[in-house]
Amino acid sequence: MDSTNGNGADLESANGANGSGVTEALPPPPPVIPPNVEPVRVKTELAEKKGPVRVPMARKGFGTRGQKIPLLTNHFKVDVANLQGHFFHYSVALFYDDGRPVEQKGVGRKILDKVHQTYHSDLDGKEFAYDGEKTLFTYGALPSNKMDFSVVLEEVSATRANGNGSPNGNESPSDGDRKRLRRPNRSKNFRVEISYAAKIPLQALANAMRGQESENSQEAIRVLDIILRQHAARQGCLLVRQSFFHNDPTNCEPVGGNILGCRGFHSSFRTTQGGMSLNMDVTTTMIIKPGPVVDFLIANQNARDPYSIDWSKAKRTLKNLRVKVSPSGQEFKITGLSDKPCREQTFELKKRNPNENGEFETTEVTVADYFRDTRHIDLQYSADLPCINVGKPKRPTYIPLELCALVPLQRYTKALTTFQRSALVEKSRQKPQERMTVLSKALKVSNYDAEPLLRSCGISISSNFTQVEGRVLPAPKLKMGCGSETFPRNGRWNFNNKEFVEPTKIQRWVVVNFSARCNVRQVVDDLIKIGGSKGIEIASPFQVFEEGNQFRRAPPMIRVENMFKDIQSKLPGVPQFILCVLPDKKNSDLYGPWKKKNLTEFGIVTQCMAPTRQPNDQYLTNLLLKINAKLGGLNSMLSVERTPAFTVISKVPTIILGMDVSHGSPGQSDVPSIAAVVSSREWPLISKYRASVRTQPSKAEMIESLVKKNGTEDDGIIKELLVDFYTSSNKRKPEHIIIFRDGVSESQFNQVLNIELDQIIEACKLLDANWNPKFLLLVAQKNHHTKFFQPTSPENVPPGTIIDNKICHPKNNDFYLCAHAGMIGTTRPTHYHVLYDEIGFSADELQELVHSLSYVYQRSTSAISVVAPICYAHLAAAQLGTFMKFEDQSETSSSHGGITAPGPISVAQLPRLKDNVANSMFFC
């Protein structure tokens, strides 16, 4: 949650996108509707909404508190000279000469470049921006609203599977196929239709900079982004959304398993208070190391040799990757593997010459024999290995493994191992000054001012970082035990010679040890001693349960069951708390089953720890921070909590919600998403929370169970949390509800405002029809590319740095906050968007509340990069996600209707937590 996550390793890049390294287009433009067609509006939840549709609120003012500080940011000023001009939008259709549409990815840019080169005068000498799919833009109109062109393209790779010059599962390569093998570069005819679609005034950009956003302004910005993507594509870059990656080995670092972290650059145009800017940042994606396929598989699976490879796993890993085949040099996309090894996999080979009757006879041969006898290639090692299939499902085309090499710049989109992720983070860190140097160089190399289309419409991009004014908010005073108080320094504090503000008592507890490498007795003695120094009374454990050696190779569930049988046989009743020593330092398979058993079957608070022979005091203090919070204690709190001085909270009963949705790993489309909402309790505290967690259809971002009607009852998340607030706050209903939403993009703000907020209001009304609480709704974004730098220091910006001017939205209420101390890499600020405010906070009040909520995270003695409720929601979703066994979703499933789903989707449900832990900070 600190700058470790803001270090330039843009881990979003492990998600989405195909694994073939093919360029991806931006989202398609709105469809063009012919004038004689009356559009029919599709009914959606937003369209059917009763009452006015909410929109993000406008900024009411700027903050003034804090010490002013000059800063630089990675936004580069964009000047637009020709605001009176227009972009013209054209639809592009590509066909082969026989009329078939071109569906092959990646060929469109080559075809359109050829059109521009061949028909330059017919196009009136105009430059154009092409998105690689079906859309083209020009500055000024083309000579005609509809134009047809024919071009001949020298094909550089044959990715369409038509036999392709290697053994086909149904027939041998034809004479034409064999000729293509000997002459891989062959010409192909294409027909291109370019049709007028729309006109986009550049004046819309000026309107957007005044806060008057429209569909035209969004389209104009989209055109500018497409121009930059085309510019990068012509330099041979891999395009990933709005990022580009050069084929330069010096930009790549190995992270293990023949996977490389490839450094590239994100670029996007933004409308800001200071005008138009280009936001440019360093980003990283994972690519596969080019080279022999067999080398990749051995490294990726950590296999001893080619004969130890797990081929079912290899088939999933290789699917859709591109290979270059020796000796022809042709490129193909992998569609699968053969069922049998080369020396056993057969196909029908058609003889070259007809027989006496003029017929071509066939004979069955193996792939290995074909390559030896016909292609004169003796296989060195792959005769006993499966073949690469580059054909179609019903017409396989097999190539021996050793003849295939992976081509450069292919994204790796599978989930990374813990080791790979750690290596990626470590190797992609950049200190602020290094990042600035790299960005300046990249901007110079990109040479956007020489881009013809930008030049023709009078757009120029400054090479200087934008200067902004920030403010450093003072850290809030914290209260600790025995009446002591402290002011954090540089976003950090400690408990040296201090007690927790509300320490708990641990009386009935046990220790379980799944590890053979931990001195448990020493851990227990030290934990009791250090706990006492923090004010926690810890009795001696009832017993230490050691796992028997005979169980250590058993499946995780069996190991957990055996341990609980042992506990139940020796312990009368359920313990208050269990300390569990896991067998592994990270990602133990026991973690999920162990947590599930404790929380859902027995209602036991449990703390897991990594095995250690000699834990130090700091490690055990950090462990006690979690244990104390889980058992209902408080480690530290804001000094103003529970006092009238905390005016924004203490005057009126106020509940704070943190909302997040956690999705499965890349490629796991069948894994349900997990929605978590946490809520503050025991008003006027803002340091204690509880969570409600539900599953929902995979990749659904809007939370679906905020209200869940079951007959006349509401079984939704919000009711559960509101009832808990009421009972824990002396039977007071919240009059103010403050919501922090994480994980949504700007395009989803309207859904959050008009669907999720409506559901929360409905949940309140279902509890009391006359209840009208006031709402404040903010969205927190970490997945952006804005960074801040100190012009006179190589260090990160100080904790508490806030920016609400110049590069913020020209109309809407947003601000950037760097609450934490960036110790490594470059600090990534959190971008807060205030979407809705009925309460009426001033800019200073709201910014100080958000800043203070970064200091109440009970697991840490440092300010965190985003408010604690959001971190807790993320932790709760992640922890309950480990409960799920998704292999068979047919068991204990129920139906949920997705927002865009045509019918009910069966989603496996999470087991309910026992009541005595449901209201705890079990996730801490």
From Swiss-Prot:
Pfam families: ArgoL1, ArgoL2, ArgoMid, ArgoN, PAZ, Piwi
Domain Piwi residue range list: 577-885
Tissue specificity comment: Expressed in embryos, mature leaves, vascular tissue of the sepals, stamens and stigma, at the tip of the style and siliques.
Chief localisation class: nucleus
PAZ domain residues: 292-408
Compositional bias ranges of the Pro residues kind: 26-37
Residue spans of biased composition, Low complexity class: 162-173
One function term, GO molecular function aspect: RNA endonuclease activity
GO cellular component: Cajal body; cytoplasmic ribonucleoprotein granule; euchromatin; nucleolus; nucleoplasm; ribonucleoprotein complex
GO BP terms: defense response to bacterium; defense response to virus; gene silencing by siRNA-directed DNA methylation; heterochromatin formation; regulation of translation; regulatory ncRNA-mediated heterochromatin formation; siRNA processing
Keyword rRNA-binding among record annotations: no
Region (Disordered): 1-37, 159-185
InterPro entries noted in UniProt: ArgoL1 (IPR014811), ArgoL2 (IPR032472), Argonaute_Mid_dom (IPR032473), Argonaute_N (IPR032474), PAZ_dom (IPR003100), PAZ_dom_sf (IPR036085), Piwi (IPR003165), Piwi_ago-like (IPR045246)
Swiss-Prot/TrEMBL keywords: Host-virus interaction, Nucleus, Plant defense, Repressor, Ribonucleoprotein, RNA-binding, RNA-mediated gene silencing, Transcription, Transcription regulation, Translation regulation
Family: Belongs to the argonaute family. Ago subfamily.
Record text on subunit structure and interactions: Interacts with NRPE1 (via C-terminus). Binding to NRPE1 is required for its function in RdDM. Interacts with turnip crinkle virus (TCV) capsid protein P38; this interaction inhibits probably RNA silencing ability of AGO4. Interacts with SDE3. Binds to RDM3. Binds chromatin at loci subject to transcriptional silencing. Interacts with MBD6.
Role noted for this protein: Together with RDM3, required for transcriptional gene silencing (TGS) by DNA methylation and repressive histone modifications (H3K9me2) of several chromatin loci. Component of the RISC complex that associate with the small interfering RNA (siRNA) pathway involved in direct cytosine methylation at endogenous DNA repeats. Forms a AGO4/NRPE1/siRNA complex in cajal body, facilitating its function in RNA-directed gene silencing of target loci. Required for CpNpG and asymmetric DNA methylation as well as histone H3 'Lys-9' methylation (H3K9me) at SUP and SN1 loci.
Protein name: Protein argonaute 4
Lineage start: Eukaryota, Viridiplantae, Streptophyta, Embryophyta, Tracheophyta
